[in-house]
């Protein structure tokens, strides 16, 4: 997991992203959506898996979902699963609050190539 600092503190994040709202930010070349709910902060991919709309233009609900502005699909902010049960899933990213700030984590993709030496 590679971690990127997105705010100086949880308080700074709360000042920039009001409760029950969402904001789109760029982190390490990825456009992600940060949602601030009663349960805390959550990070998801900004692109709706259903039709590609920006989830940053949507809104979050009291049920801890983010709602796509295009077709009103609801996605669970913890799991990324669509509430409709249609199988669409938005990528979620962990958020950690540390002494020096708030961080979002991205999985590191590694590829291993095996080559056998020909004799």
Where does each model-flagged region fall?
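Flexible, glycine-rich terminal cap/loop adjacent to redox cofactors
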Residues: 53, 73-74
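Generic recognition of long tandem-repeat/solenoid scaffolds
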Residues: 64-68, 82, 102-105
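Short linker/helix segments within small regulatory modules
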Residues: 59-65, 83-89
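Short cysteine clusters
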Residues: 48, 68-71
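N-terminal pre-ligand scaffold of iron-sulfur
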Residues: 1-61, 93-116
